[in-house]
Amino acid sequence: MKSFLLNLKTNTPTIRWGMLKNETYFEGTIPEGYALAVCPSGNIVILDIDVKNGKNGYSNIPPNILGELIHTFWYETKSKGAHYWIEYTGKETLLNTSTKYGLDLRIGAKKGNAGGYVKYHHNVDIRQCKHLIKPSSNELNQWLETLFCGVNNN
């Protein structure tokens, strides 16, 4: 993983974040007008559930999947959505992409995919939360693969 600052006026990184080495973290107090962003790595993926712009991603998650997600590390976003951090145990290559369902996936850089990042809305350093990220079940893997393995869901 790695973390860096986002300029809130432009909603863009303050650095070329793709050039940061893995396990490089922003240290110190986040200045006014900025937010912390975190990019996952390895098999860690982040399911970004949106509740904004007329979309409610929660309405597109089966109850059994949501029941599994609540046991991994997660936090609410400012728009009342959430970021669920998952250790993906499947065999497929998931894509860093958004869908029309209010569900986005952020992955680390892999196989030509630059990866992505999320605004980190938690008050504890991500390094201290890694142990809370749970492995995915076969059922969750299949659901993620249906949404994020290259089928056009935009």
Model-based region annotation:
Residues 1-154:
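Conserved phosphate/metal-binding and DNA-contacting active-site motifs used
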